[in-house]
């Protein structure tokens, strides 16, 4: 395909302003820019300072998501997202006109699936539209079946298991957990991600065919989805994109030097990396305390990411003993990909967010699963029972993990026959992840086919 035709094809990305949503979309944008397309990413003005976009082929525009004083705080997720949609639509219209005037008309808007009526919005603006999903195909199938009324979330009393098309039998504890908090209709909004997919020009999922073969096939029987993952920096996978070593976005400042220096001094496969994601996870004091002592009682070295707002939950006794035994390094943030790919890392204790799951799987790191909410329990089900690359810490009667169980699960992953089997499986999936993104791999071919259709349309 001629480079000139590619460079005249313009894709604009509209991410949802959260790190877990922006990172995979940024990776997709970088890959398309490397393949020759013109790319513009629309950033919320409030977070532009967190972005590190050095690729000259990626352009940025800013819009503000500020609410006017008269807006107040909408009473529901639907009302909130409705206001966001109105503001985004109005400002996108101006941005699209600006691009046309400058000689770079936009051919396609790739929009985070959380925005309501995304495809309708794109078509109203006279541009093709493609929702971008940041969860797995399996979770997409669960949410969609719930939208159809085939199951309820939270599940009804007495329900012990659920059977759904393409999905392994799910126990009650494998279903998504929605802690609604401010927005009691949050789950309804998640279901509404599927409201206009029949009108979409493309639908993108951050997964790959061999990872979710049956689940992707089932979703494809409903809509024309495209698997384009795993979306992590190329230097950790296929190495096609020169110097693509990070996601280019960090909402928190990481002390890279001290993390890597500490890991460099440890033996290969001897360290547990623990992190529960980029969003405040609201673990109770008792829960944090049990995790902390479980890490210490495992007798393995550990590096634990505890964001500043959660650090006060760590007891002085734990901190003193961890320092005395020189077993742990507690940091407010760290470069996760660099850490997971470090030779000293033997396992990853994770909340099972989809990005973290994909990163660990792609780097061949077995997991200790501690799912908290949203799609995480379903991801943990796949980590343990489907891909067989981790163990799940059981929850006690009070809804809190116990330190002994935490320590035992760490030992299961780090040593013995179970650990050997999990590491072997993790390395197998690492190879398949690389294969998907290599030239001619399943996701690489899917991306090339998408580009060809877009350019010729």
Swiss-Prot record:
CDD domains: GT1_Gtf-like. GO terms for biological process: saponin biosynthetic process; terpene biosynthetic process; terpenoid biosynthetic process. Keywords: Isoprene biosynthesis, Transferase. It catalyses: (20S)-protopanaxadiol + UDP-alpha-D-glucose = (20S)-ginsenoside Rh2 + UDP + H(+). An anthocyanidin binds at residue 21. GO terms for molecular function: quercetin 3-O-glucosyltransferase activity; quercetin 7-O-glucosyltransferase activity; UDP-glycosyltransferase activity. InterPro entries: UDP_glucos_trans. It is an enzyme of class 2 (transferase). The active site is at 21 (proton acceptor), 112 (charge relay). Its EC number is 2.4.1.-. It holds the Pfam family UDPGT. It comes from the Eukaryota. UDP-alpha-D-glucose binds at residues 134, 336, 351, 354-356, 359, 375-376. Pathway: Secondary metabolite biosynthesis; terpenoid biosynthesis. PANTHER family: GLUCOSYL/GLUCURONOSYL TRANSFERASES, UDP-GLYCOSYLTRANSFERASE 74E1-RELATED. Belongs to the UDP-glycosyltransferase family. This is UDP-glucosyltransferase 45. The lineage of its organism: Eukaryota, Viridiplantae, Streptophyta, Embryophyta, Tracheophyta.
């Amino acid at each position: 395909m001629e480079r000139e035709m590619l460079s005249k094809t313009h894709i604009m990305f509209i991410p949802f302003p959260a790190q877990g949503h922006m990172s995979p979309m940024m990776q997709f944008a970088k890959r398309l820019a490397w393949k020759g397309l013109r790319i513009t990413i629309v950033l919320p003005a409030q977070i532009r300072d967190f972005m590190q976009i050095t690729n000259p082929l990626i352009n940025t525009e800013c819009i503000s998501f500020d609410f006017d004083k008269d807006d107040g705080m909408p009473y529901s997720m639907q009302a909130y997202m409705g206001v966001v949609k109105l503001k985004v639509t109005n400002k996108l219209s101006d941005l699209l006109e600006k691009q046309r005037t400058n000689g770079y008309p936009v051919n396609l808007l790739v929009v985070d699936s959380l925005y309501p009526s995304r495809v309708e919005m794109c078509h109203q603006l006279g541009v093709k539209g493609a929702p971008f999903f940041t969860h797995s195909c399996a979770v997409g199938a669960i949410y969609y079946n719930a939208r159809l009324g085939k199951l309820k979330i939270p599940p009804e009393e007495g329900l012990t298991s659920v059977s759904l098309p393409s999905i392994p039998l799910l126990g009650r504890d494998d279903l998504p957990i929605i802690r609604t908090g401010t927005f009691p209709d949050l789950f309804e909004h998640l279901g509404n991600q599927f409201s206009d997919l029949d009108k979409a020009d493309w639908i993108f999922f951050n997964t790959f065919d061999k990872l979710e073969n049956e689940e992707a096939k089932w979703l494809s029987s409903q809509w024309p989805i495209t698997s384009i993952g795993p979306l992590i920096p190329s230097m950790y996978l296929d190495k096609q994109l020169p110097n693509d070593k990070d996601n280019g976005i960090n909402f928190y400042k990481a002390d890279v030097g001290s993390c890597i220096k500490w890991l460099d001094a440890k033996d290969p496969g001897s360290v547990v990396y623990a992190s529960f994601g980029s969003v405040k996870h609201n673990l109770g004091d008792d829960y944090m305390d049990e995790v902390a002592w479980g890490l210490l009682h495992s007798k393995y070295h550990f590096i634990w990411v505890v964001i500043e707002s959660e650090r006060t939950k760590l007891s002085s006794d734990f901190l003193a003993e961890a320092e005395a035994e020189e077993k742990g390094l507690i940091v407010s943030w760290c470069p996760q990909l660099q850490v997971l790919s470090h030779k000293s890392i033997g396992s990853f204790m994770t909340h099972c967010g989809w990005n973290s799951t994909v990163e660990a799987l792609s780097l061949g790191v077995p997991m200790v699963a501690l799912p908290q909410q949203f799609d995480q329990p379903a991801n943990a089900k796949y980590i343990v029972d489907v891909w067989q690359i981790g163990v799940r810490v059981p929850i006690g009667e009070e809804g809190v993990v116990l330190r002994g169980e935490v320590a035992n699960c760490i030992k299961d992953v780090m040593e013995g026959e179970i650990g050997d089997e999990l590491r072997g499986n993790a390395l197998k999936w690492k190879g398949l992840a690389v294969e998907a993104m290599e030239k001619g791999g399943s996701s690489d071919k899917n991306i090339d086919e998408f580009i060809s259709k877009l350019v010729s349309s």
